[in-house]
Swiss-Prot record:
Membrane spanning residue stretches: none
Family: Belongs to the PyrI family.
Function: Involved in allosteric regulation of aspartate carbamoyltransferase.
Protein name: Aspartate carbamoyltransferase regulatory chain
Gene (UniProt): pyrI
Cofactor(s) in the UniProt record: Zn(2+)
Annotated stretches, region: Disordered: 1-23
Composition-biased stretches (Basic and acidic residues): 1-15
Lineage: Archaea, Methanobacteriati, Methanobacteriota, Stenosarchaea group, Halobacteria
Length: 178
């Protein structure tokens, strides 16, 4: 009879028959498509891609296309995240922020589908003007024309003026990126 409702098994089979099957993704195939021009931020710690986008203020509202691959298999890291931002190259201050929050990252500049510049970010010894000091009494928080300066430590950053510590997990809270 045609008036009866199909059972779940029949329903799945008919849906599967109607939808073209996707090609199997093998180890050599890209999971995220190539971009013509822009920046690829590779080798991010797994689970950090969305934090990196938020910290850098990249949300696609400026018109750039943004692709994110999360928890992708990596020979070097085991698992990693990757971010592709079309039609935009990171400024030096954005690269400096990345160096603090994602020191293992690699930045690739893409032009006409080719990598024209590839650099591995290295953690700096100090950063200037990127963070607010958490100490309200620090000279950098007064109405003085002084840029903050933090010494980069293994566990975070230390204010060069008052000695306050910003732990690595707290860095996003104190970022001062325009």
């Amino acid at each position: 009879m045609n008036d009866r409702e199909p059972n779940q098994k029949e329903s799945k089979e008919s849906v599967n028959d109607a939808v073209p099957r996707a090609r199997k993704v093998d180890d050599q195939q890209l999971r995220v498509s190539k971009i013509r021009d822009g920046t690829v931020i590779d080798h991010l710690t797994a689970g950090e891609a969305l934090n990196v986008l938020a910290i850098l203020g990249i949300d696609g509202s400026s018109g750039e296309g943004v692709s994110v691959g999360m928890n992708v298999i990596s020979d070097r890291l085991g698992r990693k995240d990757i971010v592709k931002v079309e039609d935009r190259e990171l400024s030096q201050s954005e690269v400096d922020v990345l160096a603090v929050i994602a020191p293992e990252a690699t930045i690739n500049i893409i032009r006409d589908y080719a990598v024209v510049d590839k650099k591995r970010i290295e953690r700096p010894t100090a950063v200037t003007g990127l963070l607010f000091c958490p100490n309200r009494n620090c000279i950098t928080n007064a109405n003085e024309p002084i840029n903050t300066r933090f010494i980069v430590l293994d566990e975070g950053l230390q204010c060069d003026y008052c000695g306050s510590i910003v732990r690595e997990s707290e860095v996003p809270t104190y970022l001062d990126v325009a």
